[in-house]
């Protein structure tokens, strides 16, 4: 079974905490040892936003700001690589071909951003499609997909299950609202829809949530299930193993 995990920068490295990085690396290694082909895409988080904000004040244009964000994601990716064992490709993958080659030869592949204008949410979805992954997991700072931004609206309701088309419909208005925060961005949602990719959005602060979702199909997040994916997640996971 082939799995792509997107780990938000604010989940992996909200501050420089070696133990947190080690805990996420341990889950990635556990999945690899269980026989899964694994790739992880790491975001930039608050550090990237801080650098981008300062660079914007200095007059950097949007492409330059994106490049700074990409650099930070790759630094975070290097942190995760440093915590992983001998099965990881020691280089941060710079494109989908590099990541795909590593996965197909049995290595764990780690990548950050790759091009201006594209978030690591979208990179993870595109990578999952490129390597023909069975499952895409978004480990975010939010415990699923809501009908509104839960950080600003107390009445926001969480979805336990969505079709890919419904995910696009939920995320699209958030992408238009200044200051709103969607758990995955609109481009990622559209890529998930195009690929018919089975996807989970969950709270990644505790990396054990990732392990439980992949190994046992158990989590408290949101399942994105393509139209032909009729089984519940636990049944589907065990059937795919």
UniProtKB/Swiss-Prot annotation:
Single biological process term from Gene Ontology: 'de novo' CTP biosynthetic process
UniProt: UMP binding residues: 44, 66, 114-120
Activation/inhibition comment: Inhibited by UTP.
Annotated EC: 2.7.4.22
Location in or out of the cell: Cytoplasm
Subcellular location, principal: cytoplasm
UniProt keyword Secreted present: no
SUPFAM superfamilies given in the database record: Carbamate kinase-like
Protein name in the entry: Uridylate kinase
Organism the protein comes from: Haloquadratum walsbyi (strain DSM 16790 / HBSQ001)
Lineage: Archaea, Methanobacteriati, Methanobacteriota, Stenosarchaea group, Halobacteria
């Amino acid at each position: 079974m082939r799995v792509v995990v997107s780990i938000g920068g604010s989940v992996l490295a909200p501050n420089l905490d070696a133990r947190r990085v080690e805990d996420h690396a341990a889950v990635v290694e556990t999945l690899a040892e269980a026989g899964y082909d694994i790739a992880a895409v790491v975001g930039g988080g608050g550090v990237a936003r801080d650098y981008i904000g300062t660079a914007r004040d200095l007059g950097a244009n949007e492409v330059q700001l994106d490049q700074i964000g990409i650099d930070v994601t790759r630094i975070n990716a290097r942190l995760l690589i440093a915590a992983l064992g001998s099965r990881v490709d020691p280089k941060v993958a710079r494109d989908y071909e590099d990541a795909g080659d590593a996965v197909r030869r049995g290595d764990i592949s780690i990548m950050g951003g790759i091009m201006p204008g594209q978030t690591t949410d979208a990179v993870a979805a595109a990578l999952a499609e490129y390597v023909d992954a069975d499952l895409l997991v978004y480990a975010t700072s939010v415990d699923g997909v809501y009908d509104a931004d839960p950080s600003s609206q107390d009445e926001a309701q969480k979805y336990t299950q969505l079709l890919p088309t419904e995910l696009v419909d939920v995320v699209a208005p958030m992408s238009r609202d200044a200051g709103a925060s969607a758990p995955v961005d609109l481009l990622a949602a559209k890529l998930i829809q195009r690929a018919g990719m089975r996807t989970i959005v969950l709270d990644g602060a505790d990396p054990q949530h990732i392990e439980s979702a992949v190994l046992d199909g158990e989590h408290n997040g949101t399942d994105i299930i393509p139209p032909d994916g009729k089984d519940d997640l636990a049944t589907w996971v065990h059937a795919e193993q």
